[in-house]
A protein has these predicted regions:
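A generic structural signal for short, solvent-exposed coil/turn residues
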Residues: 17-20, 79
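C-terminal segment of classical bacterial N-terminal signal peptides
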Residues: 14, 21-27
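Bacterial N-terminal signal peptides that target proteins for export
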Residues: 2-17
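Conserved catalytic core of two-component sensor histidine kinases
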Residues: 71
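Short regulatory "switch" loops immediately downstream of catalytic or recognition motifs
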Residues: 1-2, 90
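Sequence context surrounding c-type heme c attachment/ligation sites in exported
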Residues: 26-67, 75-158
Length: 158
């Protein structure tokens, strides 16, 4: 019989992770303008959502934790974390971004920097992880980073 986890922080971690994955996938499923910058950043974030989904599945079912797969997904995020930010330079390439990306560029840059930091920390932690418990805090930080940026800089969709 499957073990039911009632740990409140674990439930929050799973919720944040799933929300980040859904937001990432939603960003890519909406109509993209014919702007290559919009397409590039949405493609990148869809890939991030896919990686978060793989790791999130392990978070939901810790007995399925596969250290090699988790390590691979975490390394991908860390290596790819700097990729989309240059595609936000043109304020005409709006896509699902809010005007705050450009009007509050310093805070947006801080969010991007934080994402790069927490994905690097997750990747480093994953290198020696033997269970989901080992990576849970770092994984939660990545999910929180996604959520924070999407809350402030992603247009709400209906």
């Amino acid at each position: 019989m499957a073990q039911v986890y009632t740990n409140k922080s674990f439930k929050s971690l799973v919720s944040i992770t799933l929300m980040a994955a859904v937001l990432g996938l939603t960003a890519c499923s909406t109509s993209t303008e014919s702007n290559p910058d919009v397409q590039a950043r949405q493609d990148t974030m869809k890939n991030w959502g896919d990686a978060m989904g793989v790791m999130g599945d392990m978070a939901k079912a810790p007995d399925t934790f596969d250290s090699e797969v988790f390590k691979e997904q975490a390394a991908f995020l860390a290596e790819d974390a700097a990729k989309p930010w240059s595609h936000f330079e043109d304020p005409e390439a709006v896509g699902n971004a809010t005007e705050a990306v450009w009007s509050n560029a310093d805070e947006f840059r801080a969010e991007a920097d934080n994402f790069q930091k927490v994905t690097a920390e997750l990747s480093a932690t994953a290198q020696t992880a033997t269970s989901m418990d080992d990576v849970k805090p770092a994984f939660g930080q990545v999910g929180a980073s996604c959520k924070s940026c999407h809350t402030d800089f992603r247009a709400k969709t209906e």
